[in-house]
Amino acid sequence: MSKELFLEIGTEEIPAGFLPKAMADMEAIVTKELENARLAFGEVKTFATPRRLALVVKGLPTVQPDAEITALGPARNIAFGPDGTPSKAAEGFARGQGVDVASLTLVSTEKGEYVAAVRKESGRPVPDLLAEILPRLVGGIPFRKSMRWADLDVRFARPIHWIVALFDGVVVPFAFGNVQSGNVSRGHRFMANQPFPVRDFAHYLDECERHFVIPDPERRKETIRREIHRVAKTAGGHLLPDEGLLDEVAYLVEYPSVVHGTFSPDFLKVPREVLITSMRSHQRYFSIVDDAGKLMPGFITINNTLTEDPSVVVKGNERVLRARLSDARFFFEEDQKVKLETRVESLKNVVYQQKLGTSYEKMERFRALAEGLADLLNPAVKAKTSRAAFLCKADLVSGMVGEFPEVQGIMGREYALLQGEDAEVAAAIAEHYLPTQAGGDLPASDIGAFVSIADKLDTICGCFGVGLIPTGSADPYALRRSALGIINIILDRGCRLSLEGEIGKALELLSAKLTRPAAEVMADVLEFFRGRFVNLMADRYPADAVDAAIAAGFDDLVDAEARIGALAAFKGRPDFDSLAVAFKRVCNIVKDGVDQPVDAALFQEPAEGALFAAFQQVRADVEARTASGDYLAALTGIAALKGAVDDFFDKVMVMAEDERVRTNRLALLTGIARLFGGVADFAKIAA
């Protein structure tokens, strides 16, 4: 009969941001431990509140199954002498495995024959195994930051105060630090902070409800979602959606209650984004909007307790928010006393990065890049692009951005509009930070796109140029996000440009700052972009189509995606596999290529002439289709060669003894390979 394991780790308040990952890590660790222990099990569920991490595992046996364990020892020639006598190595191995040396067997492996010891291992009682597994589980949860407490050697996100560990309702005994496992949990810190016994998981859930704790974060989240929408409607408006904040507050409380408050309508004179940021980032408040989407003078906050007099909580929250918004209004009014273009000079006193100079120097570099992009792609907006690039970092030295960094760019836009700047320039000031996250909004204008690409490209090339290259675990300058942002902007707006050319311009502008050879930096940055582009395309298209098309070049990203899309569509043909095999044979035999004209006079087999004639017939059309970017039509034209290619390989020995004949045949195949090589490298196609 299957049994249940229940574990709860009771702690001091753990930061909300730690909990989702901790839940996933708990599930992964216990799954691996149980599998390693040869234990079958069913559903695994994890739970978290600020004060507890818990898990339940269903379907466990009471006894571990018996097993036959085979352990490899030394190689045969080491384990036995020429006469078959066991060596000291064999005797030591047998002794270590607890078997008689005479029972050793031989096992064949890829590396040769080895001795092996086969022993039977009787299954142990599962509670005994869990007493060893659970301490490793508790101590193995990786947190971004952990701490020691008292004079203990153990670490955890926050000090542990109790542990509940039950298997089939019976305590699994173990200690972690100075805490001994038991069957006693505790209720809500403020509303029911007393111990209560636990019989099993179902009983635990019932007792938690009685003690004002909702262990399941998804249930807390749905409770909060339902209530904040209800309260917003009662207030005469609608909730401003914010899934990120909802996720966060669900891990800040054990028993959520919703509170509605208001603030003076006078504060609505402050830009909407500032008010939302102040409420969201600093107070974890939800905003309310009217039917037109206009911000209303109210907020919703989530409390961790039920109160007899909610008005006390409301007044306290309103008082705190009033102080915050008063600061915001003060900065907003004071900042307007200084023109944005005047603030630009102050960027000379702001160090962007020690080796890369000031923010003013950075602005000058990416301004030149942005102007070049405008020259190339839309000369009509060059002047506005230059102006937007000049002003876009000025709000960094404003009081508002100093207090609320999240509104950088937004405040630049607002101040620019208030000071009479062109509306497109003002919009681009905010847009140049986009996208701020994966899948986020992209610049809506060419001006914003050019400044955004230029700023991000300067950042990437500058950091790579002074050795600040992202590692697997660290990317402090968000270079991956910047590269992906550039790629998405280019694809979104159809910017036909040379990626290598723009990187070269950026490196030239950075030449006085580079601490590495420019050629090395160029190679590294191109590879960095290639990796991001491949990952992005692999989410949209078959991986082999991506690899094959990119192998033919990715300097023009718009063109590269067009080739990938065409190849992915071409793969849908019923005869694609046989086509791919034929063209892969061509690619594989002419890896280096032969650069010389084909001489029909050297043909010795009819299949040679037939292939050459077919090639000549489609060549001009395929090249024209390729040049115009109609890659699917180009591939369809190339497919017409399939029969002649197959016939050629069936009837012609490419590597003829006569060097001139051999070279002529390779030249013919080289021409064909280069015909479709402008679209993709078929050698990369899985077929």
From Swiss-Prot:
Coarse class of the protein's main subcellular location: cytoplasm
GO BP terms in the entry: arginyl-tRNA aminoacylation; glycyl-tRNA aminoacylation
Main EC class the enzyme belongs to: ligase
GO molecular function, one term: ATP binding
Classification via InterPro entries: DALR_anticod-bd, Gly-tRNA-synth_bsu, Gly-tRNA-synth_heterodimer
GO cellular component: cytosol
Keywords: Aminoacyl-tRNA synthetase, ATP-binding, Cytoplasm, Ligase, Nucleotide-binding, Protein biosynthesis
PROSITE patterns, alphabetized: AA_TRNA_LIGASE_II_GLYAB
A Pfam family per the record: DALR_1
SUPFAM superfamilies with a match to the protein in the record: HD-domain/PDEase-like
Quaternary structure note: Tetramer of two alpha and two beta subunits.
Family of this protein: Belongs to the class-II aminoacyl-tRNA synthetase family.
Entries under PANTHER family matching the protein: GLYCINE--TRNA LIGASE, CHLOROPLASTIC_MITOCHONDRIAL 2, GLYCYL-TRNA SYNTHETASE
Protein name, UniProt field: Glycine--tRNA ligase beta subunit
Subcellular location: Cytoplasm
Domain of life: Bacteria
Catalysis: reaction(s): tRNA(Gly) + glycine + ATP = glycyl-tRNA(Gly) + AMP + diphosphate
Native organism: Geobacter sulfurreducens (strain ATCC 51573 / DSM 12127 / PCA)
Catalytic activity, EC: 6.1.1.14
